[in-house]
């Protein structure tokens, strides 16, 4: 078998597992925390998988076979070498010990030029600052009216807040995918045929079901440490702010950025 093909398959498989196990929990963590008491893990996994399949299909359709939503426009496809597979392997090790790291820089640094990396760094720094500022302002305002531990939700609003978690989590998950799928798709041709697309969808679905089965793994512990992530109102606010910041930068330009930095900025501002 051609070594390039082996490196491609290994790199893609490791990147897929590492990204889904690491960054996706930063995105879906509040969803798992606030819903696991009410729904079986496979129901939650099925919901997340459905959004993922739709997001990948839409990106593939809208961007002429490119599931990265155009994030890799400035990073041309390269023949995969052994060192390209090292980055996701390191990421996998860090994930196993529960360290949330930036998959974007760890993976794409093996492919991108210095100029592109500098622009990615600047975009991520701005994303961190914006998320921290928005979260800080939002929680100052919200804390004046809501204390999840003591202010119970009025019965007539319970359904609204529980449903809002589903909607906001779905939006956040789609926006996140439009950013971070690039960290996996970088190992694949920029235009995928339908067979490869279906294979990618199947692999991601298996990974998602596994991650939900283990309830997020060690990275989920980082999310659970933050006050309020188990509550529907706080989970919704976290989701909306995170998704809004990511959506803004998605529309800003086609440069990849670190969603982990935005996540950390959000938690920093909130704390």
Where in this protein do the model-derived segments appear?
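Multi-pass alpha-helical transmembrane bundle typical of ion/small-solute transporters
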Residues: 1-271
């Amino acid at each position: 078998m051609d070594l390039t093909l082996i490196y491609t398959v290994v790199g893609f498989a490791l990147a897929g597992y590492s990204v889904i196990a690491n960054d996706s929990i930063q995105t879906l963590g509040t969803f798992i925390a606030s819903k696991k008491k009410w729904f079986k893990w496979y129901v939650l996994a099925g919901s997340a998988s459905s959004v993922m399949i739709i997001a990948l299909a839409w990106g593939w359709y809208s961007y002429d076979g490119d599931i990265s939503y155009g994030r890799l426009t400035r990073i041309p496809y390269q023949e995969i070498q052994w060192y390209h597979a090292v980055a996701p392997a390191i990421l996998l090790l860090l994930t196993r010990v529960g360290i949330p790291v930036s998959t974007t820089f760890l993976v794409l640094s093996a492919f991108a030029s210095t100029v592109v990396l500098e622009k990615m760094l600047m975009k991520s720094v701005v994303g961190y600052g914006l998320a921290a500022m928005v979260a800080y302002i939002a929680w100052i305002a919200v804390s004046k009216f809501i204390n999840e531990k003591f202010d119970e939700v009025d019965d007539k609003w319970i359904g609204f807040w529980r449903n809002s978690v589903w909607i906001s989590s779905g939006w956040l998950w789609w926006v996140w995918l439009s950013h971070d799928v690039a960290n996996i798709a970088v190992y694949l041709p920029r235009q995928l045929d339908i067979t490869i697309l279906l294979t990618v969808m199947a692999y991601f679905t298996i990974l998602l079901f596994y991650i939900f089965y283990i309830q997020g793994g060690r990275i989920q512990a980082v999310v659970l440490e933050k006050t309020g992530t188990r509550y529907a109102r706080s989970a919704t606010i976290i989701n909306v702010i995170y998704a809004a910041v990511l959506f803004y930068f998605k529309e800003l330009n086609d440069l990849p950025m670190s969603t982990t930095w935005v996540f950390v900025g959000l938690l920093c501002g909130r704390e």
